[in-house]
Amino acid sequence: MAREKLLKTEQKGWGTGGWQLPCWPIRASPYSVVDETERNGGIPKFRLTNDLSWPHAGMIEDGDGGSVASINGSMERGEWPRNSLPRAARTGEAAAILQASGAPVKVWGFDGEAYYRVFGRQRAELWRNAIAMAEGFQLDERCCFGSAADASKCSRASNLIAHAIRRALRDVDAAYPTREPAVLEWLEERRQAAAESGCSPEDAELRFLSLAYISIYIDDGTAASIDDLLFDCEGKAVMRNGVQMRRAQLHFETALETLRLLGHASSELKEQPPGAVVESLGLEINLAEGRMRILKLRREAYAAKVDKIVESGCVERSELVSVLSKLLFAASCYPAGRPWLNAAWRAVRAQFRLGGDRVLLSKKAKSGLCRWAATLRGEMADGVPLAHGAFPAFGLPGTGAVYADASGLQGWAAWTVSGDELLLTSGEWTAEELADESFIIAEKELLASTLGLVALAPEAGLSFVYSYTDNTNAEGAMRRLAPKTARMQAMVTARSAWMREQGVFECVERITSERNLWADLGSRNGVAEVERQAALFNLRVRHVQPAQAWRSTTALRDGEGYGASDRDRTE
C-alpha cells in the first residue's frame, strides 16, 4: 500500500522520482502509512505520512557531544503566528441563532480534495523531503502529513479560505436581498442590538446581520444558511429549471466555486448539500430535532476502547490519555458524564506508576469508565440542544448572577439580587476546618460558589446563573468540570447532579478581587458593612443558609455523600 501511494504522488505531479539524484544534498525521510479507518467513521482510509520527527532525541550523535535534531524538533514554533481551530459545535449554535429569525434554515458542508497536496514548498526546503524506494529517490514537492510546519501552514491557509467564502456569501446576499418579512424584522432587531453593543458597522455586518455562518477546520467546511426564496434587487424571482431558487443552495454553490478559484477542489463524495442534517468532525448537527450528538460509529468505537482499558486493569499512560481525551470530546454532547472521568485523570497524574509508564486503574476509575461505556451505547444518543453553549442575557426573566468569595482564615459569602432584596448567604470556618492544612483556598472558593448556587438560585427563581469567582482553580472546576483535588471533584459531582435535577444552568465568569467587594466583605466578617451598603441602594437584606448536607466538609473529606440529602434551605 505504501508503494502504491508513493507512485500516486508522481502520477499526480506532486513529486518527481528516479535514480538520478534530483538535488544535492538530499535527505531521505522515514515514512509510514497511518490507518485512519476508525477516525473516518469506519470507512477504510490510509494516509501516507512523512516522519519529519525522526531522528528522535538522543538517537544520533552530532560529534560535538549533542544529538542530531529532527526537522520538526529544530523548528522555533514559539515564533509562529497563533492559530485557533474552530469547533464543529459552533455551527449548531449558529444555526439556532439563524432559526430565531423564523425562516427555514439549512446546514451544509464540504471537504477539500487532497488539501495538503495542493500547497507547494519553498525550493530551499525540497532537498530534505526525499523518500528512498525501489524505483529510486522520490522528491516530495508538496506539503505532507508528518511536518509540523505544514500542519500550521495549511491550517492558517484555511483562515483565508473561510474569509474568502464569507465575502463571497456577503456578495450573494447583497445581490439577492431577503424579502422574507420575518427575516427583515429579525435583522432590524439585531441591527439595534449591534448598535447598543457599540459594534462598528463592519462588526455588525459580520456578527449580527449575516444570513449565513461558515467555519473551516483545516479542509472540513461546515455551514448554516437561512433558506428563504431568492429575489434579485428589483424583486424578480430567481428561477432555475422552472423552480425558484433558495438561498442555502446558492450559498453552497458559491462556497464550492470560491474554493475552486483559490486552487482547491471539493471532494464530491464528501459534499453535503443543504439539508436538515450535517455531519462534521464526529458530530451530527440535526436541525429537525434541534440537537447535536456524537456520531453513532464514533460512539461505538469509543465504547470499545473503554471496554478494552477496563478489562486490562492497567494501561500505558499515553493510551489512557488518548481515550480520556476522546471522552472529553464526547462529554461536549453529554456534560453530565464529565465528572465520571475525574478518578481516571487522577490516576494519570499520580506520581506512582507501574513499570513502563503504565497506570493502574482504581475501582472508582473503572466505575466511571464503565458508566461512560454504557452511556455511549445508550442514552447519549439524545445529544444536547443546538445552542447549549449560549446563555441568556443578564436581566432576562430567570437569569441572574451569584457572586461568591472565601477567605483563607475567616469564612465565606455569596450574594445575589432578586427584586428589591439582597439575598445573602455566609458563614465562618470551624476550628476543625482551620486546623486542616489540606483544605486549600481553591477548595474553599469552590465551596463558597457551590453554597451560593444551591442556596440562592432557588430563592431568586433563577434557572440561568452567572457565577462569579476570583479564583482561577475554582473557575476551571466549574467551567470545564476539571477539578484539581478530590474535595473539588466531590463538589463538582454533587453540584452538577443538583443543577441537572433542578433544571439550573450555569455560566462561570472571572471577576477581580477588587470588584468582588460584597462577597469579599461577607467572607471576612463584614456582613454588617454589606447590609449598610445595601441599604444605600434601598435593598432589603435576607439571609439564606444552605442545608448542612452542602456545608459539611466532613463529607467532602470522606468523598462520600456530599450534598446527597437534606437539600432544603434554612432561613
Locate each region found by the language model.
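C-terminal functional segments of enzyme domains
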Residues: 279, 283-288, 502-560
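Catalytic-core region of right-hand nucleic acid polymerases
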Residues: 6-163, 242, 293-346
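A short, polar/acidic, helix/strand-boundary loop motif
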Residues: 135-160, 191, 244-246, 308, ...
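Inter-domain linker/hinge segments that demarcate the starts of reverse transcriptase
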Residues: 1-22, 87-94, 158-170, 238-266, ...
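RNase H catalytic domain
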Residues: 214-220, 225, 233-236, 454-517, ...
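Catalytic palm subdomain of template-directed nucleic-acid polymerases
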Residues: 57-72, 118-121, 180-262, 284-293, ...
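C-terminal reverse transcriptase regions that engage the nucleic-acid substrate
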Residues: 274-390
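Metal-dependent nuclease catalytic cores in nucleic-acid-processing enzymes
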Residues: 88-99, 157-163, 442-464, 492-502
